Amino acid sequence: MRKAKPNAAERIESYLVKLIQERGADKDQPFAVRMLLAFLKFASCLFAAGVAFRYFLYKTGLKRRYPLGIQVISIGNVTAGGTGKTPVTEIFARKLAAEGRKVAILSRGYRRKEAPWWVRLFTQVVTKPLVVSDGKHVLLDSATGGDEPYMLASNLPGVAVVVDRDRVKAGRYAIKRLGCDTLILDDGFQYQKLKHSIEVVLVDATNPFGNGQMLPRGVLREPVRHLKRADIIFITKCRGDVSAVRDEVRKYNKTAEIVECNHTPKALRDVWSREEYPLSWLEGKTTCTLSGIASPKGFENSLRHLGAKVVWCERYADHHRYDSSEILYALNRTADMGADALVTTEKDAVRFPRFETTPVKCLYLRIAIEILSGQESFDQIISRICFRRNREG
């Protein structure tokens, strides 16, 4: 079976991502690429102006921030993709639920199946938010609810997950209909419409701020100086000395608590049966990988650190929605190469169509956050949320 070709939008996206990640001088590029980079730079200036104007509207009160009367913990970043928000969201939700809080995670549900924009335009006011989980049962699949919301709902029994573009509406629904007393705003740093009690910001130690430029010429969603709004900063993917990253962060925020953490493999499971294998199973095994995430190299290197020999890597654009032919192609390619297993990420696994039989094992690697330093600071933040009177910060 031949490999299905990525669509034009994915090819363009992949090319642009590769282009903006390159750190060489623009003058060293071919003329056509220099023209494209100049256009992206111009677009970045427009984007930066739009971001500044938007924050001006909120700061002056011309646009309103809505308090909901309970604790709202925003978890986000200043860059586009790849910092590891989902595991950090999970650790916050799990800890708060264990302390007796009734938690709801609010998400936009990025790249989920939605009605056309003209339908949403006329139905947004009357349409109810989507409840991926009510805290007791997972009610929607990943296509309808979104990859991250479905994954969080599956991993967090007792925690509600609510999806809507309007997170204020989603929050009100979680409070009124689900009885929640604590809200976690997933990817919330840029979402200023809902007033935040605590601002948690993630910084990727392996690539803190990209090339330092705003989208689309760089990866910044807003200026790095906006780190000053953070109450707690998680430096993620810490391997080795990250003092330089810590010092850089301190230039923009002198007072925030800093937590250093790593994304650590915790389990290896069959994609469909959920049968669990010890991580030691990978040692000495020949594997192939399939992923559609923002930072695939980190995932592939994790397998190598666990002792696997990775012989083939198939990468798709972030949040790629797989069809059966793509999965079957990867499985057959893995079998043809004599590899022991096709390994994917947990986020990708929720997007796989189901197969009753496969020519080779298909496993996913479950990742969790391991706090390396700053555990006391994290615990203090949790206590601050749990024992502060229910008021908006």
Predicted regions and their residues:
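A transmembrane-helix-recognition feature enriched in membrane-embedded lipid enzymes
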Residues: 8-71, 385, 389
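Residue-level signal for inorganic ion chemistry
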Residues: 46, 86, 152, 186, ...
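Glycine-rich phosphate-binding P-loop
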Residues: 73-92
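N-terminal phosphate/diphosphate-binding loop that engages ATP/GTP or pyrophosphate donors
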Residues: 91-159
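Phosphate-binding/switch loop-helix module in NTP-utilizing enzymes
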Residues: 151-195
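Conserved catalytic-core segment of NTP-binding enzymes
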Residues: 173-176, 188-281, 288, 300-301, ...
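Redox- and metal-dependent alpha/beta enzyme cores, enriched for Fe-S-associated oxidoreductases
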Residues: 266-269, 273-275, 280-324, 379, ...
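Generic C-terminus detector
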Residues: 335, 339-341, 347-393
